[in-house]
A protein has these predicted regions:
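C-terminal substrate/ligand-recognition segments
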Residues: 5-6
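Alpha-helical support elements that line or immediately flank enzyme active sites
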Residues: 14-24, 158
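A cross-family detector of function-defining hotspots
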Residues: 11
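Conserved small/polar residues in nucleotide/adenosyl-binding loops
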Residues: 1
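Long, charged, mostly alpha-helical binding arms that flank functional sites
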Residues: 27-179
Length: 179
């Protein structure tokens, strides 16, 4: 498997494939090549030092966290399409990570554990059954999207399950049972 931006497809990837097939052992060096777009500035312009529109990923990671930058890039990774990158989008991903942290902390403070088996379905209330059903649907959709290299859609599905279904609905409705 090889991930590569389309800008050097013929200069690098094609050369490696031909070299492997004809100059080495006759085997193709990659079974899959996934082309991704280029990361551009927030206005869709190519990043360059002379324009002054480049970003320092280390700076973004220090300010927003590594996971926020990773999630932003993955969420914009549509196969073969360029993606614009704006600082406020990375900030939004940091807010998403914070939302997940707070939801987990809330659950742990109210007796959730990260080990063991789920209770029998018959003993669950309606809202618990609903969230487990939504989780199962989400896992199935995300697995399918990842298998077809649709990382942006997979991330979007994860985002909406976690933010909308889990945090906005399930946790809010479940708070009464902890009171």
């Amino acid at each position: 498997y090889k991930r590569q931006g389309y800008d050097i497809l013929f200069f690098w990837v094609a050369r490696m494939m031909l070299f492997g097939l004809f100059a080495m052992d006759g085997k193709q060096p990659f079974h899959t090549i996934a082309l991704h777009g280029l990361v551009r500035d927030q206005f869709g312009k190519k990043m360059s030092k002379s324009r002054g529109n480049t970003i320092d990923p280390i700076e973004f990671m220090d300010k927003y966290g590594t996971d926020a930058l990773r999630f932003t890039l993955a969420r914009g990774a549509n196969p073969g399409k360029d993606q614009a990158l704006a600082e406020d989008w990375v900030g939004g991903s940091r807010n998403f990570a914070t939302k997940l942290w707070n939801a987990t902390r809330f659950a742990m403070m109210n007796g959730a554990t990260i080990q063991g088996e789920l209770p029998a379905t018959a003993s669950l209330n309606g809202i618990d059954k609903w969230i487990l059903s939504r989780l199962s649907e989400t896992i199935s959709e995300v697995d399918s999207l990842l298998e077809s290299y649709e990382f942006a859609r997979a991330c979007d599905r994860i985002y909406h399950f976690a933010w909308d279904d889990l945090c906005d609905w399930y946790l809010e409705l479940s708070k009464e049972s902890f009171a």
